[in-house]
């Protein structure tokens, strides 16, 4: 009987230890908020570009800001070239951080290349280009998407231009690649977003009145409103935001109660690139050369005929 009881207790203890081990393992294996911050989109979307053409970064960075992308008009197979995403903004601007303090803006970018294009291996990147991209870490959007690259967050003051060293594919070694014109999609953001992936608002939003009424009290971190139907509602004002209403002021539904702290935003740009065949270029040059030679010979022949005709007329 004692042995049976001891056996039961031993089994229960082992099960308890196993369950505890699984709980601890799962806690440490979950992505932490600080680690997940640069890759919110990667966790939530299979592709950074929606069916309507919009890049998903715009779902959290609501303000529209300009972004530019520069790529060569055409590239040869198996060559390294620069793709540049420009994210301009006023470097004197400061954003509201999560703590409510003011701080410098950071930037991030996504580059969607045609199939087969990818970030160039380190041994293929020229030394001059390495100096220009020093400190930039390039990450695949998904493990199996070599042609979709994300970067950031980076210091905005030092990275208003982000250079991507790109290696073009070679149709001679990959039968799935063909010469032709392809689309390139780029997106760039500066500053913090207004929406978390959960749908909750960040503190980079103006606080608005939930209903029409009169402001009954104002403090540094809250505004109380007596609505037109006699109810009282209190809106919290996150740290770093400035209250723009005063007691006794009438406010409409949706009217701002605080300043708008957002100084950032997102922008996207589409362009095209041609994967050009070197053989085609050579034959094109031969064709143009043949035309030029033919035209030259025709001109010479015409002058010769004119001389003969002039001689016959004089005779």
Swiss-Prot record:
It comes from the Bacteria. Its main location: membrane. Gene3D superfamilies: 2.40.50.100, Cytochrome f large domain, Single helix bin. Binds 1 heme group covalently. The chain crosses the membrane at residues 281-301. One of its GO terms (molecular function) is heme binding. One of its GO terms (cellular component) is plasma membrane-derived thylakoid membrane. Its cofactor is heme. InterPro entries: Cyt-f_TM (IPR024058), Cyt_f (IPR002325), Cyt_f_lg_dom (IPR024094), Cyt_f_lg_dom_sf (IPR036826), Rudment_hybrid_motif (IPR011054). Residues 1-36 form the signal peptide. It is a single-pass membrane protein. Keywords: Electron transport, Heme, Iron, Membrane, Metal-binding, Photosynthesis, Signal, Thylakoid, Transmembrane, Transmembrane helix, Transport. Heme binds at residues 37, 57, 60-61. It is found in: Cellular thylakoid membrane. GO terms for biological process: photosynthesis. Belongs to the cytochrome f family. Component of the cytochrome b6-f complex, which mediates electron transfer between photosystem II (PSII) and photosystem I (PSI), cyclic electron flow around PSI, and state transitions. The 4 large subunits of the cytochrome b6-f complex are cytochrome b6, subunit IV (17 kDa polypeptide, PetD), cytochrome f and the Rieske protein, while the 4 small subunits are PetG, PetL, PetM and PetN. The complex functions as a dimer. This is Cytochrome f. It comes from Acaryochloris marina (strain MBIC 11017). The lineage of its organism: Bacteria, Bacillati, Cyanobacteriota, Cyanophyceae, Acaryochloridales.
């Amino acid at each position: 009987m004692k042995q049976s009881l001891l056996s039961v207790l031993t089994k229960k203890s082992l099960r308890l230890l196993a369950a505890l081990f699984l709980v601890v393992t799962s806690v440490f294996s979950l992505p932490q908020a600080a680690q997940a911050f640069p890759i919110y989109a990667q966790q939530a979307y299979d592709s950074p570009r929606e069916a309507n053409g919009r890049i998903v970064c715009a779902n959290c960075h609501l303000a529209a800001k300009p972004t530019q992308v520069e790529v060569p008009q055409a590239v040869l197979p198996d060559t390294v070239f620069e793709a540049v995403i420009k994210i301009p903004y006023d470097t004197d601007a400061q954003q509201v951080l999560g703590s409510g303090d003011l701080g410098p803006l950071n930037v991030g970018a996504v580059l969607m290349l045609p199939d087969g294009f990818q970030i160039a291996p380190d041994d293929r990147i020229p030394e001059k280009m390495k100096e220009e991209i020093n400190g930039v870490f390039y990450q695949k959007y998904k493990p199996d998407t070599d042609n979709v690259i994300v970067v950031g967050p980076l210091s905005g003051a030092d990275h208003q231009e982000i250079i991507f060293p790109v290696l073009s594919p070679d149709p001679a070694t990959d039968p799935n690649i063909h010469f032709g014109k392809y689309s390139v999609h780029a997106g760039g953001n500066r500053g913090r977003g207004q929406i978390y992936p959960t749908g909750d608002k960040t503190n980079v939003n103006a606080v608005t009145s939930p209903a029409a009424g009169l402001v009954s009290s104002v403090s540094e971190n809250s505004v109380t409103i007596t609505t037109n139907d006699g109810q009282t509602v209190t809106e919290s004002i996150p740290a770093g935001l400035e209250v723009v209403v005063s007691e006794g002021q009438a406010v409409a539904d949706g009217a701002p109660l605080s300043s708008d702290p957002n100084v950032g935003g997102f922008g996207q740009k589409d362009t095209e690139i041609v994967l050009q065949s070197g053989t085609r270029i050579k034959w094109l040059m031969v064709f143009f050369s043949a035309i030029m030679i033919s035209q030259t010979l025709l001109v010479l022949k015409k002058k010769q005929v004119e001389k003969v005709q002039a001689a016959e007329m004089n005779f």
